[in-house]
A protein has these predicted regions:
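Active-site activation/catalytic loop segments of kinase-like enzymes and analogous catalytic loops
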Residues: 165-174, 232-267, 281-298, 310-318
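ATP/Mg2+ or Mg2+-diphosphate-binding catalytic cores
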Residues: 289-345
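Juxta-kinase regulatory segment immediately upstream of eukaryotic protein kinase catalytic domains
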Residues: 1-13
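A glycine-centered beta->alpha junction motif in the catalytic cores
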Residues: 50-59, 104-119, 165-175, 239, ...
Length: 345
């Protein structure tokens, strides 16, 4: 790591290292404090350490990169594409030759959630800016033939079904009625077909209030390495429903923000609301399954502590969707809902 920093700033001294909170991935983050060096040497930089070249779980499931995996880090590949279309990404200062580490611009410690919930903050304005940025990014991020990995994978019927199965396998009590589970699978298969028929655009995939930072009055976007093609409202649903976000984004504010996005993106508001509900329901079911998987299989109990917020969101969207009575009932009677712990938030 020291050699990686010195390659970028030969005259700088490493004055200190401190851990930075990460997320569900195999990546770890450190903040390096730097002294001296050339005029372009920042006071701090972020060091990302990777256990492997890692791609998203479903990317592996779809085998889009073949048995040997991607040729380069997806983070670097997607960054190269996006950085020509927005200045919201952190700069990549250096990447290790073996792809086990990279040095990034430090975009601070203020996720969008903290900015929106700070005393005196205007949540509608904060989240609205994030939606404006998203709409602009979607409008500019067309495939240019440069080899961006996002255009090699998409939320198609197969992937939607895979994520629904992930929910059934890990999010529901295995002792639930076999008949109810069979009907749930049939309902979600039909929903996967509806979702797969929607037009697809460039999608961050985890565009939520902890992957957006407010840094020196600018919104900065991180964790974009799992980008793919998906319905346009998927990232909107991610932003407005992830984790504890519905504590802040009530139905009235949600409706206002969806209208703002629709106007900025140039899509009919009624179509945006319908697609939003479908995407939000699919995504929150995936999250219920994923958080249980992370807690039970990967040994990360903090994710189980978020489920008491996530499960009510799943029930709310189940009530908005036609044709899912068995799924709706299982969300009431057989879902694994975790236990609350404020420290996990």
């Amino acid at each position: 790591m020291r050699s990686l920093l010195s390659q970028r700033w030969p005259d700088a001294q490493l004055a200190g290292l401190e851990g930075v909170r990460g997320d569900a991935s195999s990546r770890r983050y450190l903040r390096a404090r730097l002294d001296g060096g050339a005029s372009d040497c920042p006071e701090t930089a972020i060091v990302m350490l990777m256990e492997d070249a890692g791609v998203a779980l479903s990317s592996d499931e779809l085998s889009v990169f073949g048995d040997d995996g991607p040729r380069e880090l997806p983070f670097v590949n997607v960054w190269r594409f996006l950085s020509t279309r927005t200045d919201a990404l952190p700069e990549i200062y250096r990447v290790a030759d073996d792809s086990t580490a990279m040095v990034l611009e430090d975009v601070g410690d203020t996720p969008l959630w903290d900015a929106a919930t700070a005393p005196g903050a205007d949540p509608e304005a904060v989240f609205g800016r994030a939606l404006d940025l998203l709409a602009d990014l979607q409008a500019s991020a067309a495939d240019d033939g440069s080899g961006c990995y996002a255009f090699k994978q998409s939320f198609d019927e197969r992937l939607f079904r895979w994520e629904f199965e992930h929910f059934i396998e890990y999010g529901l009590d295995p002792e639930a009625s076999a008949g109810a589970l069979t009907e749930c699978r049939a309902e979600l298969a039909r929903l996967a077909d509806r979702l797969a028929a929607l037009p697809r655009v460039f999608c961050h995939r985890d565009y939520h209030a902890w992957n957006l930072h407010l840094h020196r009055s600018r919104i900065r976007v991180i964790d974009f390495q799992d980008a793919l093609l998906a319905p346009a409202l998927y990232d909107v649903a991610s932003l407005l429903t992830d984790r504890i976000t519905p504590r802040l984004i009530d139905p009235s504010l949600e409706a206002s923000l969806i209208t703002r996005y629709a106007q900025h993106a140039g899509v009919p508001a009624d179509r945006a609301r319908e697609e939003y509900n479908l995407c939000a329901f699919q995504r929150v079911l995936k999250v219920v399954g994923r958080f249980n998987f992370l807690a039970e299989v990967k040994g990360k109990p903090a994710y189980a502590a978020m489920l008491p917020d996530v499960v009510p969101t799943a029930r709310e969207f189940a009530a908005r969707i036609d044709g899912v009575p068995a799924t709706r009932e299982l969300l009431q009677s057989a879902v694994k809902a975790g236990q609350a712990r404020e420290a996990a938030l």
